């Protein structure tokens, strides 16, 4: 018996991925007012290493109905930095946030001119990540990857979720990285 997500939320992670990377349905979204400066993904399981869209689709397909498929965080970046500096700063932040726990993620940097004054840039980072870590090195199929973790036999269950509570940061997780 599979407890698949309701259709309403089934593809929310995949849609989130397409939104931040401006692909598929979102390829022309905001193209006149916002620029996609950079996008990257990392820490993907082997079956999604070359195609992060496959990972985000599988998250929606196989995560339990009430399970969180992904988390999306938007962070304003300093407008004084140039594009390369924004990429470097974003990579540093994401490495601290997702890298040390080997959480799969995709991110994008968007930039647009302020609508209030029409002069200043408003660069921002979109981070989409999964709490299901690949740190244990166990290769799992997409179906198994999103099942409940089995501590006694990790190879028989899904990848462990490293929530903010599990890593000891609780609801103050974002403040830790400020």
Residue ranges and their predicted role:
Residues 1-178:
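N-terminal nicking endonuclease/strand-transfer module with a His-rich metal-binding environment
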């Amino acid at each position: 018996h599979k407890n698949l997500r309701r259709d309403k939320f089934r593809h929310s992670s995949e849609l989130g991925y397409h939104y931040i990377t401006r692909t598929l349905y979102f390829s022309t979204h905001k193209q006149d007012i916002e620029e996609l400066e950079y996008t990257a993904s990392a820490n993907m399981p082997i079956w999604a290493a070359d195609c992060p869209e496959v990972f985000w689709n599988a998250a929606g397909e196989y995560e339990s109905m009430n399970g969180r498929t992904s988390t999306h965080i938007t962070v304003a970046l300093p407008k004084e930095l140039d594009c390369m500096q924004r990429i470097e700063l974003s990579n540093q932040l994401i490495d601290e946030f997702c890298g040390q726990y080997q959480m799969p993620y995709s991110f994008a940097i968007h930039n647009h001119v302020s609508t209030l004054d029409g002069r200043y840039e408003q660069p921002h980072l979109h981070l989409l990540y999964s709490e299901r870590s690949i740190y244990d090195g166990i290769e799992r199929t997409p179906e198994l990857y999103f099942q409940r973790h089995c501590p006694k036999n990790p190879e028989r269950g899904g990848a462990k979720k490293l929530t903010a509570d599990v890593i000891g940061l609780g609801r103050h997780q974002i403040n830790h990285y400020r």
